Design a protein with these regions (language model features):
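Exposed, interaction-prone regions of secreted/extracellular proteins
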Residues: 2-321
Length: 321
């Protein structure tokens, strides 16, 4: 039976007053995602160069959101905004993922370049991806590519690239405490930040330095990033009968459920070229949701959480058949 792959994602555009748009070289974000996910899934069969085994397994879920989606507007062709990283606190959940090669995730992106001439990205968060880990637990992950997901790049330590330095936190490790509906909530602070002296891009989990990406593997990120992103995404397969998947995003509940019921990102910050963290205003954020009847998001701000958003959904439901 022929199965068709379908992607659903949430995109939160950060509109710093210089640029608003789509990814360079693409008419809409879904064009990039469609090809990107296909190429990433093809890389799952690559042999591992090195692996670190965690005593409690592996876990992670991911969500997409885009900050500075593009520089396509003709009024802004000669303007550039530079970023040295991203910070956010991401809640951990264990959504239902239906099939082996389907996934649900929450993540942050650091991006430069474009699809046609070579997209360079550094990505990290949590995901559930049975095809990679052999189970349906949420796991901490990292990913990189220096050529639009074509030949270079991989998850975690599955190829040369990311350099692990921590003996306490392993990429691919299971996140064995996760949030429950109306119960305890668990999250973690994730930071990707460029060291101005060495040029290394460091990945930090809470206060632990996990490791780094050397800039030579992502040459377009050697100086800075042009886009920062946070968000959520699922990929699912259909037999063509037209029904939506039961694969969940986030907690499996809609954003309006709020705290203890919906998944969230809070304490959103981007890092400027002085390596100073800046909190974006909710007024400078625009959301793109491909299937709002299946998954949605709500943005807000508070003194305790800074700029934040709730997101997610159950997938198939009476309004999303």
């Amino acid at each position: 039976m022929m199965l068709n792959k379908i992607m659903v994602f949430l995109i939160l555009h950060m509109v710093i007053p210089i640029v608003v748009g789509t990814f360079p070289g693409k008419s809409k974000p879904s064009d990039l995602h469609e090809q990107e996910i296909e190429l990433r899934l093809k890389q799952l069969n690559k042999p591992a160069i090195k692996s670190i085994h965690s005593p409690d397994g592996d876990i992670i879920d991911c969500v997409w959101i885009y900050d500075q989606p593009a520089f396509d507007h003709p009024l802004f062709k000669n303007h550039t905004i530079q970023f040295h990283g991203s910070k956010s606190r991401i809640s951990i959940w264990k959504p239902n993922v239906l099939r082996t090669r389907e996934f649900s995730l929450a993540q942050t992106w650091v991006v430069n370049g474009d699809w046609d001439t070579g997209l360079n990205t550094l990505e990290s968060g949590w995901q559930i991806l049975h095809a990679l880990y052999g189970d349906k637990n949420p796991r901490l992950f990292a990913y990189w590519t220096g050529d639009t997901y074509r030949e270079t790049g991989c998850y975690n330590l599955d190829c040369p690239g990311f350099v692990q330095v921590s003996r306490h936190i392993s990429l691919g490790a299971a996140l064995n405490t996760f949030s429950t509906y109306n119960g305890e909530q668990y999250d973690f602070l994730l930071t990707i930040e460029k060291d101005q002296e060495t040029g290394l891009w460091w990945l930090k989990f809470e206060t632990y330095l996990i490791g780094y990406w050397p800039s030579f593997i992502v040459p377009k990120l050697a100086a800075s990033a042009r886009k920062i992103a946070w968000g959520g995404e699922i990929v699912y397969y259909t037999s063509g009968r037209g029904t939506h998947t039961l694969t969940q995003m986030g907690s499996g509940h809609f954003a309006e459920k709020g705290f203890r019921k919906a998944a969230y990102f809070n304490s959103l910050e981007y890092i400027d070229t002085s390596n100073y963290p800046i909190t974006p205003s909710p007024q400078n954020l625009e959301a793109t949701v491909t299937r709002p009847e299946c998954y949605n998001l709500q943005v807000g701000s508070s003194q305790r959480w800074g700029t934040y958003f709730f997101y997610g959904g159950p997938g198939r439901n009476p309004h999303c058949p």
